[in-house]
From Swiss-Prot:
It comes from Capra hircus (Goat). CDD domains: ATP-synt_Fo_a_6 (cd00310). The lineage of its organism: Eukaryota, Metazoa, Chordata, Craniata, Vertebrata. Belongs to the ATPase A chain family. This is ATP synthase F(0) complex subunit a. One of its GO terms (molecular function) is proton channel activity. It comes from the Eukaryota. Pfam families: ATP-synt_A. The chain crosses the membrane at residues 9-29, 68-88, 97-117, 138-158, 184-204.
Length: 226
């Protein structure tokens, strides 16, 4: 069956019902519950990675910011595992959907901004009026700063969506070219297959890095408001 280039990005359905919820919950099965933890190499590696990321992201925060540690660590695990599972053949990657990424970015961004206005009202309002600004430029700067503030969650979501989607499209195109060249030019097909393997390895790195960058930017937004 011939598939469209964007078939893998279509939300899967069963009996007329979307399966996105089940797909989103699936990564949680990869992490053992606390009563079944075994001190093996995999668990030790997960704990080391979580401690390293927590130290890098949360060391800049004060006590109020530290309360977000569990949420941010859960966020990076969820996005990272979802991105990596999406590299499996004939799988669906929820992070290629802008609506889902906006659903993650907007509440986290709004929570950080509301925290800032509650705890540091004057400092938060001061971001709209940089010190030393000439009086005629004040209205324009307030508008620009307001727009830049509301663009932050959109930038978070679009960045994650665009990078993951672009990687999947490249794999799809090169994989299709490899199959087409198999009967025409085996040597060229072998070269494209090697490129496909390298690109897949790069996609594993990209999926992990995008999860880190998304969570890090949320952490920085939180730092600016606590």
């Amino acid at each position: 069956m011939n598939e469209n280039l964007f078939t893998s990005f279509i939300t899967p359905m069963m009996l007329g019902l979307p399966l996105v919820t089940l797909i989103i919950l699936f990564p949680s099965l990869l992490f053992p519950s606390s009563n079944r933890l075994i001190n093996n190499r995999l668990v030790s590696l997960q704990q080391w990675a979580l401690q390293l990321m927590s130290k890098q992201m949360m060391s800049i925060h004060n006590t109020k910011g530290q309360t977000w540690t569990l949420m941010l660590m859960s966020l990076i695990l969820f996005i990272g595992s979802t991105n990596l599972l999406g590299l499996l053949p004939h799988s669906f990657t929820p992070t290629t959907q802008l609506s889902m990424n906006l659903g993650m970015a907007i509440p986290l961004w709004a929570g950080a901004v509301i925290t800032g206005f509650r705890n540091k009202t004057k400092a938060s309002l001061a971001h709209f009026y940089p010190q030393g600004t000439p009086t005629p430029l004040i209205p324009m700067l307030v508008i620009i700063e307001t727009i830049s503030l509301f663009i932050q969650p959109m930038a978070l979501a679009v960045r994650l969506t665009a990078n993951i989607t672009a990687g999947h499209l490249l794999i799809h195109l090169i994989g299709g070219a490899t199959l087409a060249l198999t009967s025409i030019s085996p040597t060229t097909a072998l070269i494209t297959f090697i490129i496909l393997i390298l690109l897949t390895i790069l996609e594993f790195e990209l999926g992990t890095r995008e999860a880190y960058v998304f969570t890090l930017l949320v952490s920085l937004y939180l730092h600016d408001n606590t």
